[in-house]
């Protein structure tokens, strides 16, 4: 197309040049004949030499994003990175299972023979003496805390919690028995003793262990007309209340014998 444009341009130039040429005839009359020269474009010349490379054109617009290509090949394994910081101490784990039992160790050297029979006997006797002394000391501490007495009786409040049967044995071991309030005077003295000690209740020497409802004193003598049963008592609750307690007001309740509480002992002066 460029060649065609060049040919057309050459033709236009030739025509323009022709129009500028003077006429082939001098000034003549109109009657004279005049010859006209017509210039015809020449043949197409040979292609010229290749011109110099032009300056780069302006960058074009950014084209549309192409389609996502296929995943490339996996790269080679990189070098090992630096060690990170030490993390916080984790929570303590659960205890593991016990390991297998190890093999038995070697046998030890034989021990030195000992005649221990007499030594064991002596140690046993010492243990008994210590136990007896400990019991005596507790009893003395209770006695020092205060006694109550009448013309014929001495009453001791024992601040050791025991079951009914053990309390009775403790009093008997000292030559007495659990306190037996057989009249108003004895009952009042015991109640006052209990209240002044700041205690709420104690075991006393009354029970119906042998026959339900037939209460007797700890010396096995039957109860007479005197009693200080509280309202609704005795009621043998849960069919297991065969022993008796005294409260600070002086009233009596039947209670279970297996519970533990403080107790009061009674001693005859003539037997001391």
UniProtKB/Swiss-Prot annotation:
Disulfide bond sites: 171-265, 243-257
Tissue: Highly expressed in embryonic murine craniofacial cartilage, heart, bronchi, kidney and vertebral bodies.
Annotated Ca(2+) 1 binding sites: 208, 212, 236, 241-242
GO cellular component: collagen trimer; extracellular space
MF (Gene Ontology): calcium ion binding; calcium-dependent carbohydrate binding; D-mannose binding; DNA binding; fucose binding; oligosaccharide binding
The keyword Lyase belongs to this UniProt entry's keyword annotation: no
Residue spans crossing the bilayer: none
Chain sites annotated for binding Ca(2+) 2: 233, 235, 241, 253-254
Main location: secreted
Keywords: Calcium, Coiled coil, Collagen, Developmental protein, Disulfide bond, Immunity, Innate immunity, Lectin, Mannose-binding, Metal-binding, Secreted, Signal
InterPro entries given in the database record: C-type_lectin-like, C-type_lectin-like/link_sf, C-type_lectin_CS, Ca-dependent_lectin, Collagen, Collectin_CTLD, CTDL_fold
GO process annotations (BP): antimicrobial humoral response; complement activation, lectin pathway; developmental process
The UniProt record lists the keyword Metal-binding: yes
Coiled coil: 117-149
Region feature (Disordered): 45-110
Domain named C-type lectin: residues: 150-266
Basic and acidic residues bias spans: 46-55, 67-76
Family: Belongs to the COLEC10/COLEC11 family.
Function in brief: Lectin that plays a role in innate immunity, apoptosis and embryogenesis. Calcium-dependent lectin that binds self and non-self glycoproteins presenting high mannose oligosaccharides with at least one terminal alpha-1,2-linked mannose epitope. Primarily recognizes the terminal disaccharide of the glycan. Also recognizes a subset of fucosylated glycans and lipopolysaccharides. Plays a role in innate immunity through its ability to bind non-self sugars presented by microorganisms and to activate the complement through the recruitment of MAPS1.
Complexes and interactors: Homotrimer; disulfide-linked. Interacts with MASP1; probably triggers the lectin pathway of complement.
Annotated protein name in UniProt: Collectin-11
Annotated source species: Mus musculus
